[in-house]
Amino acid sequence: VRPSTKEWIQKMGCADFGAGKDLGYWGWHPGEIDVRWTRSVVSDGKGGLQLDAPLSMSLGQDDAECFVQRIAGNDWRLKNVGVENLTIDSEYDTTNPKDENHAWEGVYINKVKDGWVRMVNFRHLAGSAVVTQRDASRITVEDCISQAPVSEIGGYRRRTFLCMGEQCLFQRCYSEQGMHDFVA
């Protein structure tokens, strides 16, 4: 676990996104951006822990507030599940090109390990075609197409492929008219 302390946020330069102005609400805040990884310890030697997969950032000697936390019990996530060969087309008000009173996400993945989304066509969504949440791990999203989103153009909309999970692979995916076609 990499806690989001005030010192670390300052070190990362993420305390203020207001172009030097005092707009602190735009920056990161302690405790809100903690980074967690789910890994297995392969070996425990003099040099430290050897993990089954790399971390998404390096941890040095100056990162004393980082810690390893044991997860008790069995892995509680669904395993080896997927969605494939499907079309998801959201109905919307055709008289309103900015309609948002309809489906926002096509496939929402949470609490899943070793999952996939394959060969899925998405149409007319307001938000994301695929969302992998923080409790999703080892997810593959491939050969998917997102077309003709219907929503306003603004925050939290049209983030076509949104990855907050870990060890995820997105490949051969296509998106039209997204605000941010891939977000991690």
Per-region residue spans from a language model:
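All-beta strand scaffolds that present successive hydrophobic residues in beta-strands
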Residues: 83, 115-119, 138-142, 165-173, ...
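Short, charged beta-turn/beta-strand-edge "cap" motif at the junction between a beta-strand
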Residues: 4-8
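Small/polar beta-strand repeat architecture
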Residues: 10-100, 104
